[in-house]
């Protein structure tokens, strides 16, 4: 299964993952489990009062798990300079310092600057608030024109990887091709050989329309260029 394969890839390698909602009991439980099993090195973001208060209230032991308070980060000035540079005139220093009080922006900058390898968020933050900092500060990987997302759905022995359910609202044909290629690449990174279907509201030509036409054209193009079924 995908989760097992991912654990094998990172276990014992000291991969640092930032958790933006270190005050949430679900996040703390996950961080404790990941650390105890040496899967990753979790980093909880939040104030000491928030993190300790949650742990005490829920009888959780977060001792030994790294914690970073955005209000007392020793490299904050360096982070501010870097973020001002990345925003290219869209945010001045004052606005950047305000934004970095949010653990979403702060955590994203930790990843961007190499202090962490990845970020997990969305337990309490909305999808938009979780994704926006990455779109602004990390952006698309080299060779990609857009950023897309994928969901992993697991039920018993079945697993599906679905993209793109949260980023691109009305993709055109070119976008659909790129999203499909990105999702297939992600599947392989997860240890799954992709077998792809493009979904719309038409079944075997039962309906026509712009959305159906885009999917049909994207499917035809992918059959010619893709190295998957």
What do these predicted regions represent?
Residues 1-229:
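Anion-binding alpha/beta catalytic cores of soluble intermediary-metabolism enzymes, centered on
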